[in-house]
């Protein structure tokens, strides 16, 4: 399945904020303003989100056709769920915060989407999924090996697990490496916190294969993306405000053509497509 223009994958329906919304809705709308509605306060963040958006959809649509069943774990405001539903996939939205389901429903225009709030690993789904999507989650858990194995258990034989996470090899990362941690349980009290402040481990490329093997998965594709220049990490935010998007996208494409060893140190984000054996 081919990706076309970026706009096709953004939910087009805009909701109007209300003063009586619960706090989680207001927070979700705040992120939607910069991520899908174009009200950008930090251009580097917006470009990084756009890169992750496109890479995530590409990792899925390269191998799955419309009609495939996809579980979006910890889906929050549901933008990936909505986009995939509009592309014709049979999507199940999931999040611990049950009240967010109605916020997602406000933005839903077309496509099949079901809602399953709660701990995805404790819910009784009627069948396994063709793909499970875990975006920006694994860096918030103390035991990424266990998390990956539990997510893999929801995938049918021959199906896929698609993950995005910050690249642990990025030169500005100062967090510990999971594979070098003697006792990850010391981080359990800090897990599940939101945003970058809640990051515990950022996985390195060389950790992906061992984690996949322990989860009974194979690694089909690893994509490194988002230059620190386009993410505004090296004092480029003022430039990003005035540069044409075409120039920013060109800088991003050039960064992805770097030698593999350099990309592991220079690029901010990582996307992985795992496959479960038949």
Language model features with spans:
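A short acidic, Gly/Pro-enriched loop at the edge of an enzyme's catalytic core
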Residues: 121-132
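Conserved SAM-binding loop of SAM-dependent methyltransferases across substrates and taxa
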Residues: 77-87
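Conserved class I S-adenosyl-L-methionine
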Residues: 67-76
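Conserved residues in the N-terminal Rossmann fold of short-chain dehydrogenase/reductase
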Residues: 117
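Conserved SAM-binding motif I beta-strand of class I
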Residues: 90-95
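S-adenosyl-L-methionine-dependent methyltransferase catalytic module, highlighting the catalytic core
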Residues: 5-55, 79, 96-103, 107-108, ...
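Glycine-rich helix-loop-beta junction characteristic of Rossmann-like nucleotide cofactor-binding loops
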Residues: 58-65
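A short SAM/SAH-binding and catalytic strip from SAM-dependent methyltransferases
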Residues: 133-142
């Amino acid at each position: 399945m081919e990706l076309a223009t970026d706009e096709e994958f953004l939910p087009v329906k805009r909701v109007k904020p209300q003063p009586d919304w619960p706090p989680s809705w207001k927070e979700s709308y705040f992120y939607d303003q910069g991520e899908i509605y174009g009200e950008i306060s930090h251009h580097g963040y917006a470009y990084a989100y756009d890169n992750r958006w496109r890479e995530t959809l590409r990792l899925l649509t390269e191998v799955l056709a419309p009609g495939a069943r996809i579980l979006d774990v910890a889906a929050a405001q549901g933008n990936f769920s909505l986009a995939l539903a509009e592309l014709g996939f049979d999507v199940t939205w999931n999040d611990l915060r049950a009240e967010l389901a109605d916020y997602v429903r406000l933005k839903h225009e077309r496509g099949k989407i079901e809602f399953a709030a709660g701990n995805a690993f404790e819910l009784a789904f009627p069948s396994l999924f063709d793909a499970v999507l875990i975006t920006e989650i694994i860096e918030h858990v103390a035991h990424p090996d266990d998390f990956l194995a539990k997510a893999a258990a929801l995938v049918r034989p021959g199906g896929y697990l698609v993950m995005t996470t910050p690249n642990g090899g990025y030169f500005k990362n100062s967090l510990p490496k999971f594979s070098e941690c003697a006792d990850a349980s010391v981080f359990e009290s800090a897990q599940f916190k939101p945003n970058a402040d809640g990051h515990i481990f950022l996985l390195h490329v060389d950790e992906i294969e061992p984690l996949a093997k322990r989860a009974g998965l194979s690694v089909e594709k690893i994509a490194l993306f988002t230059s620190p220049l386009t993410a505004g990490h090296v004092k480029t935010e003022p430039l990003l405000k005035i540069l044409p998007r075409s120039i920013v996208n060109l800088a991003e494409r050039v960064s992805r053509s770097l030698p593999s060893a350099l990309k592991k140190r220079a690029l901010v984000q990582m996307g992985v497509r795992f496959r479960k054996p038949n």
